[in-house]
């Protein structure tokens, strides 16, 4: 739906609804977490959550891109995150690990998403689902990583 003047109902010219993107990120977190815990096959995890997501209004294409991206590039994401962690990737709490992998994927592979949006969404997701101080850890890791990964955008 559009507002008068031809802009999408959410007021963004690029057609992206930030609310739907946030929901897609939350569902992607749940899918990545389930995959980490179960060790299931990527396609099965995506199919299960995509089916469930069809009933929830969210950006399904973005959800699928995030989950596939993390599952396909897990080794590269973990390698990229390692210099910014104070412990091994597998030692990070499972929720925070999933949040960090999703955010790393967006920072490294989704240059169309501003780094501040990625970090803020990761912090809010960690607050909602993670441990008591997990969001602080996520913030510190991603702030340091973004300076390197998005040098031009962050002004470093």
Swiss-Prot record:
Gene3D superfamilies: NusB-like. It holds the Pfam family NusB. One of its GO terms (biological process) is transcription antitermination. GO terms for cellular component: cytosol. GO terms for molecular function: RNA binding. Keywords: RNA-binding, Transcription, Transcription antitermination, Transcription regulation. Belongs to the NusB family. Involved in transcription antitermination. Required for transcription of ribosomal RNA (rRNA) genes. Binds specifically to the boxA antiterminator sequence of the ribosomal RNA (rrn) operons. This is Transcription antitermination protein NusB. The lineage of its organism: Bacteria, Pseudomonadati, Pseudomonadota, Gammaproteobacteria, Lysobacterales.
